Amino acid sequence: MAAPSLRTARLLLPFALLAAWLAVGGFLGPFAGRLGEVSTNDQAAFLPRSAESTRVLTEQRAFRQRETLPVIVVWTADGGGSVRRQQAAATTALASLTRTPGVAGRTSPALPAEDGRALQGVVPLRPDLGGRLPAALDRIRAAADRVPGTTAQLAGPAATQGDLGDAFAGIDGLLLGVALAAVLVILLLVYRSVLLPFLVILSAVFALGLACALVYALADHGTVRVDGQVQGILSILVIGAATDYALLFSARYREELTRHADRFTAARAALRRSWGPITASAATVALGLLALLLSDLTNNRSLGPVGALGIGCALLSSLTFLPAALVLLGRSAYWPTRPRATDGTDSAHGLWQRVAGVVDRSPRTVWASCLVALLACAAFAPTLASRGVPLSETFVDDAPSVTAQDTLDRHFPGGSGNPAVVIADAARLPRVLAAARHTEGVASAAAVSASGRPGAEPLVAGGRARADVTLRSAADSDDARDTIARLRSSVRAVPGAHAVVGGYTAQRYDTLRTAERDRTLIVPVVLAVILVILAGLLRSLLMPVLLVATVAVNFLATLGVSALVFRHVFGFSGTDPSVPLYGFVFLVALGVDYNIFLMSRVREESLRHGVRQGVARGLVSTGGVITAAGVVLAATFAALGVIPLAFLAQIAFIVAFGVLLDTLVVRSLLVPALVRDIGRLAWWPGRLSRRPDVREVPRTPRTADEVR
């Protein structure tokens, strides 16, 4: 029994840490609900910095007083007939908006479709409206609804941005609530402890509050950029990672309580043996996310530092707040059970003992069967189309802007309202227009005039002139992107024109090309970072290669299954170009996490008992807690599905399914069987590869999973 003065001294640090985190939660916790104040859902964030379409955006500023965000108003007759009689009223409604707050400049007249069954007009809005955009859209909708005998709808970039804002509305409370509820239910079912799940969740909430406060400060000063997508991923990432790290530490502490009567000694032993794998895991995820800084897409670059900061906060909370809380509570934290050194084993231990026995007896059969199954799934990975999705598939539900765009496409040329923008030297503009009109897939091409009237003198700025080119295909279609490629070739062929092509479709085309380039660059960097971290942790060169290879196979298998599910279950024709990259970064980094936890324990046991027994002991010791952590992480990412955006729903499925596949198959069967079959050589050139194996009768290891 420690002396009272010594016990008091040992309580000071845990109490100080607990007080510090309670202060963090009290003062910084509200920032988790305030990130929306500094976030923006401007679609310009998805544009490549160095792309031709981005250059066009820059040049366009010379042709007008300010940037605009257009709203396309489309009218159809209530009875489905002609709307030509309402054209004057529609033009009047548009003109009445000119001096409305948020409108940037003159509105267009209402123009009829060739079939006479629809009208369209454009209202230019200021691009910096932010939270005032919904009110501006409401005013436009109210004016458009005053045209008698018609139904008015709003399409175009501003309407889409408004629907994106609606999709992310309430993201703070809803997403966090769903994620935490899922975590709590799983922890209560798995650990059958009343207090521990709440401590784990409190640790995750404190980490999220600290991360959001730091990100808020950085975003408020313009250092990082935050949108609803980054905000949602940050919440899920921090909750999932903090829960995982907390589970791994609490499991190791519980195990040490079965070895040490003194809770302080048990806490020191748990920290000493768990901080290395947990820190390596956090470093893997953080550095993998920071690799996104190499991306040319603003949104990807924003997620990198924001996500890495969140992982750092999760690590800090899990290795400071949780140990302090657990050491103060001692064995009471696991109530109604109280782990003691005399405790025995239970059925959960028996399950992993049986799994380890199968792996030990038939390792080659186990890993070969797993590998064949994974490769069979991976065979479908090339069928996952990541060339972007049409606007109709951007939202999981039918958004008003999507319905309006469908109406527009039925009555006007596919690219109407979203023309390609061509900027060229003014002296060569007639030849550029001729080249554009002769390009396959182009419906019309006209110079932009100062008066806005067709056929008037072209507007010239700095010796450059602008033309709008309407495409025959829908602006978000594959055919339209192919037309952009042909259009660029055509106008570049005009000598001395120095023509560049931008606009909505060109931006999508450039984003696709940039996403392909990003994958080619970032994937090898992430793999290299993981290999270096694993080599340093495991003191081996062959083992890191083996682990990364298994995680890569798991990723490809996940993509294969996702391709089938997206097309045949969810009805998605494809994915956003960034989905495979995000899936890779999250799944590979998080997948390596579980291999780090497993193999660091296998190495620890192998140094004591030999490689063969080390594999079995490591699997039995970590099986329950890693499986629980994987289920929790999968459920946390699945919570992204509550946001009605296809992009996040696809990320949610890929990561959730991939984590479960990795946890239940790769980490539980494939990796242990491979290491068992390869033997000491798997640890080459570390000292384990040179040590003779110890042959002894396995005794039942004592772990956190044994005591319930």
Task: Show where each model-derived region lies.
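Short, contiguous strand/loop micro-motifs
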Residues: 43-44, 80-81, 299-302, 342-343, ...
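Membrane-embedded transmembrane helical bundles of large multi-pass transporters/channels
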Residues: 1-38, 103, 127-386, 505-708
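Structured non-transmembrane domains adjacent to transmembrane bundles in polytopic membrane proteins
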Residues: 49-70, 78-161, 383-574, 596
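A general boundary/transition motif marking the beginning of the first structured unit of a protein
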Residues: 48, 313, 343-347, 396, ...
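Short, solvent-exposed beta-strand/turn patches at coil↔beta or beta↔helix junctions
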Residues: 40-48
